[in-house]
């Protein structure tokens, strides 16, 4: 008996059981049978509809049918009645699109279609986006089934991408190719300037060779001579026209050239003096007395027209410098009464050894034999600040250390211990600095506004950075035409917007703005590293000796003579925004290690360093960890949890990140070391208020390395200095710094690209 017939018999039996009555005999049989068959067919239609929507009931009926076959039930005796078999793979048995197979045990569903997971009967959508099939920064949209990726991000191109299933998503990634905007013309660099393609974007650089100007004023072919304001330039073809604060124009010879700007000659060693004399009268027009060795002070003790920096017998006494115990003072007899490193002719303590020749008050008498080291007319034995002039000898905390030199003037600490070299004694050093400018909150005149310079023009205890009336003249800074100089009347005879009281000298420090390195800070007027702090970064190590620093050219040149442990020479002036430049030169063919400079120095655990290694080398002391130095220029942020010592020493040597010590912010991808006896000019821009850092290096007139924009806010300002590590005979010449809080144009472009 077929399953359909069995169902028919069951339906007829059900009809009779519900009181439909017996089938009558006789002449009325045919109509009655017809009606019952019609009713039966209607009932079967209901059953079929029920089978479509209820899978469980279908399964039950299938099992019932199979049981009917097993019981051997006979066809109904009703004449003329036929039945059809019920299909095992009824509609809805399997998920749409899944193959259904009839078996002896019932219907069997095949696998779920691509993009779904389940048993074939029930399938759910797979989220292919979890496999990250799209290009970074591109949104993935999951669909049912499959996925698709949105368009490639700005700066990239590529086809649309979509697919179905995890396997496809894992093995087929969206491909977006960098657009070279410099080749396609999709950039906004001014004509005749350098366009540098970057991943997903581009950067605009200086003018191309043969052109002068910048991205703001445009690049004109040399010979056209235009100034930034568009006026014809009076400068030499190798000079740049600079627009000063007062609107006047100045001419400055380009890197690799020297002179007065109206005339420029080749400057091989980049010390600011031309190789040959120029036909102009200014000092910088004179012939360089050491053409290949930078000596920005042009010192020449024996006046033989050969500078001391390159004269094998600088003092002309017949004794070579290497053997001369007074290389800069003529002393052919080489007499040395106290047997130190210095002959009597140049020894500031002839009868007492003092190799350091330190002379705090610069009176010609070394500290080692001077009974009044600071020159305040109080003998050392009675002076509570023997190295700092303090006539009043005040000592607020009574610890025997005068307030003028006490690193905790309100707290008893006679030992003056200061492990992090920040001039705040450990006894009162909280290390709480919420604005990150290097001044702890209790000593910061603007605790919540970064102002590393701590400038306070009206000396009211409130820093200019958070004072709305810097000069305390009753006129708010926002409308004061002399913000730093009291002028309540606001006189301005020429009506140029700058008050008469500060015309030409904005900070009234008696140094005109044109030559003032910080025209808005009366405390800083000229570049000067004559007073500096020595910081030894591995004080306990015995691998090498400490650095030996020599300052020349009235504080604008520093020489380090020894193969030494890592160390710093740090100036005392702190800066907010700053431009820092100088000439770097290793004047020897001996060794191949690190030299560089620092900025943002806040303490011996917190500073930025730009350092250059000549050759790859593993540090010779593997304790506390192996450190490998790679050749090339590196920019690092130092935030050491231990401070000076072997941990920081090895972290500085290592090219890369070291946890809790050093982060590598940028490395010159050329991996090129410095060359022996070759001069390089660096230019640093630091704007701590936004974290902007950019450093460039020139070899002669050619740009050889450019970090482009680096953003980091670990140090919100600080002091400047120079750095050495295991390298002798380093010269930092023609040093210049300048206060500058103006945000460079490329900062905004970089910020938008990152966003």
UniProtKB/Swiss-Prot annotation:
Cofactor note: Binds 11-14 calcium ions per subunit.
Post-translational modifications reported in the UniProt record: Proteolytically cleaved by metalloproteases ADAMTS4 and ADAMTS1 with ADAMTS4 showing more potent activity.
Modified residues (Phosphoserine): 394
Gene Ontology cellular-component terms listed: collagen-containing extracellular matrix; extracellular matrix; extracellular region; extracellular space; protein-containing complex
Cystines in this chain: 89-100, 94-109, 112-123, 129-140, 134-149, 152-176, 182-195, 189-204, 207-219, 227-241, 235-251, 253-264, 280-285, 290-310, 326-346, 349-369, 385-405, 408-428, 446-466, 482-502, 518-739
One example GO MF annotation: heparan sulfate proteoglycan binding
Residues that carry a glycan: 119, 740
Domain TSP C-terminal, residue spans: 530-744
Domain statement: The cell attachment motif mediates the attachment to chondrocytes. It mediates the induction of both the IAP family of survival proteins and the antiapoptotic response. The TSP C-terminal domain mediates interaction with FN1 and ACAN.
Gene Ontology biological process terms in this record: apoptotic process; artery morphogenesis; blood coagulation; BMP signaling pathway; bone growth; bone mineralization; bone morphogenesis; cartilage development
Species per Swiss-Prot/TrEMBL record: Rattus norvegicus (Rat)
Renumbered residue ranges of the record's region COMP N-terminal: 21-84
Keyword Endoplasmic reticulum recorded: no
Region (Disordered): 295-501
Basic and acidic residues compositional bias, start-end: 332-344, 350-365, 412-424, 456-465
InterPro entries: ConA-like_dom_sf, EGF-like_Ca-bd_dom, EGF-like_dom, EGF_Ca-bd_CS, Growth_fac_rcpt_cys_sf, NOTCH1_EGF-like, Thrombospondin_3-like_rpt, Thrombospondin_3_rpt
Spans through the membrane: none
Keyword Secreted (UniProt): yes
Name under which the protein is recorded: Cartilage oligomeric matrix protein
Domain EGF-like: 85-124, 125-177, 178-220, 223-265
Keywords, comma-separated and alphabetical: Apoptosis, Calcium, Cell adhesion, Disulfide bond, EGF-like domain, Extracellular matrix, Glycoprotein, Heparin-binding, Phosphoprotein, Repeat, Secreted, Signal
């Amino acid at each position: 008996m077929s399953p359909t017939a069995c169902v028919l018999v069951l339906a007829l039996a059900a009809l009779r059981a519900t009181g439909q009555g017996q089938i009558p005999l006789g002449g009325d049989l045919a109509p009655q049978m017809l009606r019952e068959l019609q009713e039966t067919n209607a009932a079967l239609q209901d059953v079929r509809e029920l089978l479509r929507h209820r899978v469980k009931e279908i399964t039950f009926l299938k099992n019932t049918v199979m049981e009917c076959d097993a019981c051997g039930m006979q066809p109904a005796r009703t004449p003329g009645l036929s039945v059809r078999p019920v299909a095992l793979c009824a509609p809805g048995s399997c998920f749409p699109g899944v193959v259904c197979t009839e078996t002896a045990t019932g219907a069997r569903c095949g696998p779920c279609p691509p993009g779904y997971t389940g048993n074939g009967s029930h399938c759910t959508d797979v989220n292919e986006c979890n496999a990250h099939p799209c290009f970074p920064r591109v949104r993935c949209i999951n669909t049912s089934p499959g996925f698709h990726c949105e368009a490639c991000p700005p700066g990239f191109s590529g086809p649309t991408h979509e697919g179905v299933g995890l396997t496809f998503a894992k093995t087929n990634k969206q491909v977006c190719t960098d657009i070279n905007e410099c080749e396609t013309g999709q950039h906004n660099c001014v004509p005749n300037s350098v366009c540098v393609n970057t991943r997903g974007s581009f950067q605009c650089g200086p003018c191309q060779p043969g052109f002068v100007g910048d991205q703001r004023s445009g690049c004109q072919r040399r010979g056209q001579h235009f100034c930034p304001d568009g006026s014809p330039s009076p400068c030499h073809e190798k000079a740049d026209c600079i627009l000063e604060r007062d609107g006047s124009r100045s001419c400055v010879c380009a890197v690799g050239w020297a002179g007065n700007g109206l005339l420029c000659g080749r400057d091989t060693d980049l010390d600011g003096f031309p190789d040959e004399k120029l036909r102009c009268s200014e000092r910088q027009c004179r012939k360089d007395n050491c053409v290949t060795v930078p000596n920005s002070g042009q010192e020449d003790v024996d006046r033989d027209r050969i500078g001391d920096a390159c004269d094998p017998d600088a003092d002309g006494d017949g004794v070579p410098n290497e053997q001369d115990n007074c290389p800069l003072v003529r002393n052919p007899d080489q007499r040395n009464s106290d047997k130190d490193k210095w002959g009597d002719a140049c020894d500031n303590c002839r009868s007492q050894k003092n190799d350091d020749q330190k002379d705090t008050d610069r009176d010609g008498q070394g500290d080692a034999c001077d009974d009044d080291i600071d020159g305040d007319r109080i003998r050392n034995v009675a002076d509570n600040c023997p190295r700092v002039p303090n006539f009043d000898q005040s000592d607020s905390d009574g610890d025997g250390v005068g307030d003028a030199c006490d690193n905790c003037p309100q707290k008893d600490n006679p030992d003056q211990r200061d492990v992090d070299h920040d001039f705040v004694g450990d006894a009162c050093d909280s290390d709480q600095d919420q604005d990150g400018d290097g001044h702890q909150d209790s000593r910061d005149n603007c605790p919540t506004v970064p102002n590393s310079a701590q400038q306070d023009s009206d000396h009211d205890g409130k820093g200019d950075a958070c004072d709305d009336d810097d000069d305390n003249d009753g006129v708010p800074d926002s409308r004061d035409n002399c913000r730093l100089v009291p002028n309540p009347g606001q006189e301005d005879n020429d009506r140029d917007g700058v008050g008469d009281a500060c015309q030409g000298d904005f900070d009234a420090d008696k140094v005109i703005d044109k030559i003032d390195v910080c025209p808005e800070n009366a405390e800083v007027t000229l570049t000067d590293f004559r007073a500096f702090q020595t910081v030894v970064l591995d004080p306990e190590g015995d691998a090498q000796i400490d650095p030996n620093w020599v300052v020349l050219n009235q504080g604008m040149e520093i020489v380090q003579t020894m193969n030494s442990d890592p160390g710093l020479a740090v100036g005392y002036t702190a800066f907010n925004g700053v431009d820092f430049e100088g000439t770097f030169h290793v004047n020897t063919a001996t060794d191949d290690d690190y030299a560089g400079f620092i900025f943002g120095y806040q303490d011996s655990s917190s500073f930025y360093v730009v350092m250059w290694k000549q050759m790859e080398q593993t540090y010779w002391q593997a304790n506390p960890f192996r450190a490998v130095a790679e050749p090339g220029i590196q920019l690092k942020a130092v935030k050491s949890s231990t401070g000076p010592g072997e941990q920081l020493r090895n972290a500085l040597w290592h090219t890369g990140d070291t946890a809790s010590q050093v982060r590598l912010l940028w490395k010159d991808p050329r991996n090129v070391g410095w060359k022996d006896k070759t001069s390089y000019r660096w230019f640093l821009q630091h704007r701590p208020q936004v974290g902007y850092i950019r450093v460039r290096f020139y070899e002669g007139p050619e740009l050889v390395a450019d970090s482009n924009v680096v953003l980091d806010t670990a140090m919100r300002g600080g002091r400047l200095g120079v750095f050495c590590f295991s390298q002798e005979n380093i010269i930092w010449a023609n040093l210049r710094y300048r206060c500058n809080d103006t945000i460079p144009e490329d900062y905004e472009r970089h910020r938008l690209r990152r966003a």
